[in-house]
Amino acid sequence: MKTFPVSIVTPDGPVYEKEVEMVSVKAESGEMGILPGHIPTVAPLKISAVRLKNGGHTDYVAVSGGFIEVRPDKVTVLSSSAEEANHIDIHRANEAKRRAEQRLQDKQAHVDFKRAEMALQRAVNRLNVSDMK
């Protein structure tokens, strides 16, 4: 099957750069599956896992939202943070989840609930993706 290059990039640099047969992402508008030769598209992403298939192997990368740019010959994912499943520090992700849950339980006016909810979503996503390795 044909392949195409995929780059997942954060402000700190590239996280994933390989040739794949298919990319699956969760865009704000729904699930997207991208194969070689896909029409050009740009879409905002949800906090989720990016699935990258090549042959019988699937890689998973946790992304904290961002954008996907699809060109017929290349796919680029831009995200504020991204981690491959096998590089996720499970202890750190559990601690982030615990802290976010604690902030959400605090009924104090100074707590930014939207920010705490986003932190919880990112931590849960990282834990879910780490289970996919």
UniProtKB/Swiss-Prot annotation:
Where does it reside?
A: Cell membrane
Which Pfam families does this UniProt record tie to the protein? ATP-synt_DE, ATP-synt_DE_N
Keyword field contains Membrane: yes
Keyword Ion transport listed: yes
Recorded GO cellular component terms are: plasma membrane; proton-transporting ATP synthase complex
Q: How does it sit in the membrane?
A: Peripheral membrane protein
Q: Describe, as the record does, how this protein assembles with itself and its partners.
A: F-type ATPases have 2 components, CF(1) - the catalytic core - and CF(0) - the membrane proton channel. CF(1) has five subunits: alpha(3), beta(3), gamma(1), delta(1), epsilon(1). CF(0) has three main subunits: a, b and c.
HAMAP family, per database record: ATP_synth_epsil_bac
Name this protein carries in UniProt = ATP synthase epsilon chain
- The protein's organism comes out as Bacillus cereus (strain ATCC 14579 / DSM 31 / CCUG 7414 / JCM 2152 / NBRC 15305 / NCIMB 9373 / NCTC 2599 / NRRL B-3711)
- Highest classification ranks of the organism: Bacteria, Bacillati, Bacillota, Bacilli, Bacillales
